[in-house]
From Swiss-Prot:
Entry-linked Gene3D superfamilies: N-(1-d-carboxylethyl)-l-norvaline Dehydrogenase, domain 2 (1.10.1040.10), NAD(P)-binding Rossmann-like Domain (3.40.50.720)
Upper taxonomic lineage: Bacteria, Pseudomonadati, Thermodesulfobacteriota, Desulfuromonadia, Desulfuromonadales
Repressor recorded as keyword: no
Protein name, per record: Glycerol-3-phosphate dehydrogenase [NAD(P)+]
Subcellular location: Cytoplasm
Length: 333
């Protein structure tokens, strides 16, 4: 299969490498022409995945039209806040039967839309019928190292889901199917907010009890938002919900948890972000999730406190105190 991968961050590079290893003809698009030249010469992405040599047959380009044109499949791995613009540029070049796979995690700040809703606004209906959404508990470095990993692909068309499942799966990468697009997407986006909170808790030295409470109650908030958007509750118990949440809240490779750790230790958000090359989606997603919950009329106390910490400069210790002193209630809604 002839595949284009749009986005050469750590995850896009890893997926392109995996697909090339799986025997497909893959071209990886990077915005930076100088990065493309270096990848061609060294078979390494020295900016975002420097410790791994990429598959020898993987091709590279900074020409978006070239990467999108005539492909059987195009994988979208651009950051969520720029995905709309990138897809608009790529769409005129796509073949009629191209399968689109979104592997971007996030909620668009301006519209409060998950990526599937963004694509609905920029793509014709016939293209949306051939779209799928990939999400789950994945650190790019571990997949690049061929460490066993499982995740979920969601599509309205089961045949498309089966095709994507088959193309991506290999001895170390197992893909499950779902038809709950919104649930799979929201799990991958909202867990980043809870990971920031878990990192703050760890940075404050609050220990494992507090982290477990945040993960569990955070999952409840994610599920409430999802159900309000007509996602299936059980989806949040799966790989794209609980699985991704646990990984991102506990794994040392989590960028969002790392940002939270530094906040808990007293560093300023702007100082933390200025020293990061890769995107921590959770910061922007916190704003979107907070506004989305307000719009939906959903109670999300952890997300609300994260908004106050990140955007209103609330002291994290005060936020924890306010969470602990809320009115007492039953655990299950």
């Amino acid at each position: 299969m002839n595949i284009g991968v749009i986005g050469a961050g750590s995850w896009g590079t890893t997926l392109a490498d995996l697909l090339s290893k799986n025997g497909h003809a893959v071209t990886l698009w990077a915005y930076e022409q100088d990065l493309v030249e270096r990848m061609r010469k060294s078979a390494k992405n020295d900016l975002y995945l420097p410790d791994f040599t990429l598959h020898e047959k993987l091709a590279y380009s900074s020409d978006l039209g070239e990467v999108a044109a005539g492909k059987d499949m195009v994988v979208l791995v651009a950051p969520s806040q720029v995905l709309r613009a990138v897809v608009r540029q790529a769409e005129p070049h796509l073949a009629k039967d191209t399968i689109l796979v979104s592997a971007a995690k996030g909620i668009e700040n301006d519209t409060l839309m998950p990526m599937s809703e963004v694509l609905k606004e920029v793509l014709p209906e016939e293209r949306l019928q051939r779209a799928a959404y990939l999400s789950g508990p994945t650190f790019a470095r571990e997949v690049a190292a061929e460490i066993p990993t499982a995740l979920t692909v969601a599509s309205e068309d089961e045949n498309i889901a089966r095709t994507v499942q088959k193309i991506f799966s290999c001895e170390y990468f197992r893909v499950y199917r779902s038809s709950d697009i919104v649930g799979v997407e929201l799990g991958g986006a909202l867990k980043n907010v809870i990971a920031l909170a878990a990192g703050i808790s760890d940075g404050l030295g609050y220990g494992y009890n507090a982290r477990a409470a945040l993960i569990t109650r955070g999952l409840a908030e994610m599920t409430r938002i999802g159900v309000a958007m007509v996602a299936r509750e059980r989806t949040f118990m799966g790989l794209s919900g609980m699985g991704d949440l646990v990984l991102t809240c506990t794994g040392d490779l989590s960028r969002n948890r790392s940002v939270g750790l530094e906040l808990g230790r007293g560093r300023k958000l702007e100082d933390i972000l200025s020293g990061m090359r890769m995107v921590a989606e959770g910061v922007k997603t916190t704003l979107s999730a907070y506004q989305l919950a307000k719009r939906l009329g959903v109670e999300t106390p952890i997300i609300e406190q994260m908004y106050l910490i990140l955007f209103e400069n609330k002291d994290p210790r005060d936020a924890v105190a306010d969470l602990m002193q809320r009115s007492l209630k039953a655990e299950m809604d």
